[in-house]
Amino acid sequence: MKIILAGTPEFSIKTFETIINHFDVIAIICQPDRKVGRKQILTSPPVAQLAKKYNIPLYQPQKILEILPVLEKLDFDLFITMAYGQIIPEVILNLAKKLSLNLHGSLLPQYRGAAPVQRAIWDGQTKTGMTLMKMAKTLDSGQIIFQAPVAIDESDTTDDLLNKLSDLSANQIVDWLDAIKNNQYQMIDQDLSKVTYAAKILPVDEKIEFDTVQKTMRKIHALSSNPGAYWIDPTRNKRIKIFRVSKTFVANAIELNCTDGKLYATSFQIEGKNKVSLK
């Protein structure tokens, strides 16, 4: 099968590399290079670097419709997206001879939308997973083809869970695509009565409002990767970003007083200083 891949961040890399090593990937699409860091260095996204590593034709349009004339000239069976970062217009979805697919980091119909991993942790879910779905015009509403679950541990941060989901997807994708190649699959409509949404994380969400230990820990761990939850320490009069906490005492950790107990920040960054991660 000839495949076009569309994705951008590190989360997509293991799955895309597995697909590259087992199928005929004829093009890769990702977001444009961006300036990052304090020095604003122009940097290629991880998926762009992957395409260059394997000498696969790479396209980085500001808007994907810009490369519609190019895609129309290509002959491909599957169009697969994973954390690409743009909504794919229907005119492009219809170009694949077999299917246009999306790998989504939740067990749809739960957590449609922009932040399924963060919201699952924040809500205290104990399980999530990966869904391979046929893409539809409406975001994350397409028919489900395959799913695989993974446990969410109490101590998992967003980075931890992204790593679990990345491994899960990479381990499943060859079997899933082989089944599609051999027409050994079914497409199941999503149960609309069970749809939930994973709203984008907004700046107003980032401030820590100390609640119970459990709720505070979940929020901190959900926001740990990006952008990071913060509070204003009254003794220092500085903003402190908290990335990971423990319920048990850790030497040199920052003590956080919740409504029903204490948490200990083991990974944090005080405004104007470097990030600290305690063992």
Give the residues covered by each predicted segment.
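A residue-level signal for conserved active-site and pocket-lining positions in enzyme catalytic cores
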Residues: 7, 28, 51, 79, ...
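Short amphipathic alpha-helix with an adjacent loop that forms part of the alpha/beta core around
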Residues: 65-75
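N-terminal Rossmann-like dinucleotide-binding module
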Residues: 1-38
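An anion-binding loop in the catalytic cleft
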Residues: 209-279
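Acyl-group handling in specialized metabolite and lipid biosynthesis
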Residues: 199-211
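Hydrophobic beta-strand scaffold residues
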Residues: 25, 58, 99-100, 128, ...
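N-terminal beta-loop-helix "entrance" segment that forms/cooperates
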Residues: 34-52
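Donor/substrate-binding cores of folate-linked one-carbon enzymes
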Residues: 20-21, 78-195
